[in-house]
């Protein structure tokens, strides 16, 4: 396996992170007919740029050489009158298929978890499509458990 660096995304990584996000959308597309598969090309760059400048967000890149082979985007939310504890949300994560099962995703999640703990988060959330059984298993093996259920009805 090539050496893979997990780091806070740098300016030179942003196009690669955008491509990683687009790949995630393409893979998740079959799980939700309302998912706009063009969103990454239409809005992804602005979203990624905003994350990279947001002090309450973390944008990680998994990089080998000069190539982004995965990413993780997450946000921190302080305690509020509605939520008694601070929390973090893992918003987006992708690893190229050839590197799955080799620890890259685990390293991304571990880095995000450490960042969230340093900020004072007491809980982390992630959403995954129920039909994406591999993703659900991945997160469950890392201590995530169902908290609420979202049901959808097509009209």
Give the location of each predicted region:
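Conserved N-terminal entry element of GNAT/NAT acetyltransferase domains
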Residues: 1-12
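Conserved GNAT-fold acetyl-CoA-binding loop/helix
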Residues: 22-47
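A short helix-loop-beta-strand connector motif used in the catalytic cores of GNAT acetyltransferases and
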Residues: 46-60, 89
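Conserved beta-strand in the GNAT
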Residues: 61, 67-76, 89, 94
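A conserved beta-turn-beta hairpin within the catalytic core of GNAT-like acetyltransferases
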Residues: 78-90, 100, 146-147
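Conserved acetyl-CoA pyrophosphate-binding loop and the N-cap/start of the following alpha-helix
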Residues: 99, 103-111
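Conserved active-site alpha-helix within GNAT-family acetyltransferase domains
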Residues: 106, 118, 130-148, 153
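Conserved GNAT acetyl-CoA-binding A-motif
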Residues: 116-127
């Amino acid at each position: 396996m090539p050496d893979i660096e997990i780091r806070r995304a740098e300016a030179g990584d942003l196009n690669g992170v955008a491509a990683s996000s687009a790949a995630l959308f393409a893979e998740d597309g079959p799980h939700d007919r309302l998912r706009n598969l063009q969103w990454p090309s239409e809005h992804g760059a602005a979203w990624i740029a905003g994350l990279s400048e947001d002090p309450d967000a973390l944008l990680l890149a998994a990089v080998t050489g000069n190539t982004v082979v995965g990413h993780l985007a997450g946000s921190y939310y302080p305690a509020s009158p509605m939520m008694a504890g601070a929390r973090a949300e893992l918003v987006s994560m992708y690893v190229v298929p050839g590197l799955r099962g080799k620890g890259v995703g685990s390293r991304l999640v571990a880095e995000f978890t450490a960042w969230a703990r340093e900020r004072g988060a007491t809980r982390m959330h992630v959403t995954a499509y129920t039909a994406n059984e591999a993703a659900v298993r991945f997160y469950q093996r890392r201590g995530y458990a169902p908290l609420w259920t979202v049901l959808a009805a097509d009209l």
